[in-house]
A protein has these predicted regions:
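Bacterial N-terminal signal peptides
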Residues: 10-21
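Sec/Tat signal peptide C-region and signal peptidase I cleavage site
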Residues: 20-28
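An extracytoplasmic/periplasmic, membrane-proximal ligand-sensing/linker region
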Residues: 28-36, 40-51, 253-313
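Periplasmic-binding protein-like
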Residues: 33-37, 45, 108-125, 177, ...
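Bilobed "Venus flytrap"/periplasmic-binding protein-like clamshell domains
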Residues: 34-58, 92, 116-193, 277-280, ...
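Pocket-flanking alpha-helical
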Residues: 67-104, 212-213
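Alpha-to-beta junction loops
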Residues: 80-89, 103-105, 144-145, 190, ...
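Pocket-lining segment of extracytoplasmic ligand-binding domains
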Residues: 150-258
Length: 313
């Protein structure tokens, strides 16, 4: 009888172990949704993230879907709705939008840090055509101006704050009619091209302001556009204003993922950075790596975003 009971216990333990393993396998998602912010050339962005897909597919035994949004809002809503699982390069302002809607929606894996000088930030800049007469923001009075996306940090949140302090008013009234028009182009690439083709006298974009000017600096919209099809870009534009340092964007993972799988995703993203850094650089759009980060790094951005939401414009 004792031998029978021992065998029954062993069988029960074996069945329980099999059930636990089956449940763990069932909890492992078969797909991983990688969110990519819009506002850049979609073909290039998807191409730059193919190596990320291949790495995560192999590392996590999943089918990684590249969710390239036409605007920043698509990724924000994807994170809030559980349709986007991980984002490597998130706008701080877009993260603030997620946080203000649901502080527990995502966790910060880390913050992007520049490989060259270990800086943890970048700048919003106003550009004009190199051969234009404009030297300062005041010179753009009465001219057409371009912002990027309403959820962009450097492409709207930061310059909007600066313009309100300098000129008064808001975007809706063109900062007390300082500009003849204020337009959201949809992204940084569109802003730069808008200046080149004469749509805007001035527009905002972003750059690390670290490294070689002629290559578009280590990271930023100039760098991406030069790599794509504008090798002489930096000879065609001129920077007339730059913001104080803005914290680099966070790398995010969704808390909607099962806890065990979420931990694997975080480990895989960090492994991508260290074991295939060239791929990580390609996806980030510049020479960056993952450094430690927390909500505190973005508190000022969150506060500015909250103020903007409460007082639109």
């Amino acid at each position: 009888m004792k031998k029978y009971m021992t065998g029954a216990v062993r069988l029960s333990a074996m069945v329980a172990g099999i059930m636990m393993a089956w449940q763990a396998a069932a909890a492992q998602p078969k797909e991983l949704n990688l969110g990519i912010l819009g506002g850049q050339n979609a073909t290039q962005q998807i191409g730059d993230n193919q190596c990320v897909k291949a790495f995560l597919d192999k590392e996590l035994n999943v089918d990684t879907k590249l969710r390239n949004s036409s605007d920043y809002s698509g990724v924000i809503q994807g994170l809030l709705g559980g349709k986007v699982d991980v984002v490597l390069s998130m706008s701080p302002s877009s993260y603030a939008s997620v946080y203000l809607n649901n502080p527990k929606a995502v966790d910060i894996v880390g913050i992007a840090v520049d490989d060259k000088d270990q800086s943890r930030g970048y700048h919003s800049v106003v550009i004009v055509k190199a051969d234009s007469p404009y030297k300062t923001l005041d010179d753009l009075k009465g001219k057409a101006f371009g912002f990027a996306d309403p959820d962009s940090t450097s492409g709207y949140l930061i310059p909007n704050h600066a313009f309100k302090e300098k000129f008064g008013g808001n975007a809706d009234n063109k900062y007390n009619n300082t500009f003849s028009s204020v337009t959201f182009s949809g992204g940084h690439e569109q802003d730069i091209l808008g200046v080149l083709n004469g749509q805007f006298a001035g527009a905002v974009t972003w750059a690390s302001m670290v490294g070689d000017y002629n290559t578009g600096y280590t990271t930023g919209a100039f760098n991406r556009l030069i790599r794509m099809d504008h090798p002489d870009l930096m000879k065609q534009i001129r920077i007339i204003w730059q913001s104080p340092l803005i914290p680099n964007g966070p790398i995010l993972v969704s808390n909607a993922l099962p806890a065990d799988f979420k931990a694997k995703v975080v480990a895989a993203v960090k492994k991508l950075d260290t074991e295939d850094h060239a791929c990580f650089i390609k996806a980030m759009g510049g020479t960056q790596h993952i450094g430690p980060g927390s909500v505190a790094d973005f508190q000022q951005i969150i506060d500015m975003k909250r103020e903007l939401v409460l007082a639109p414009g």
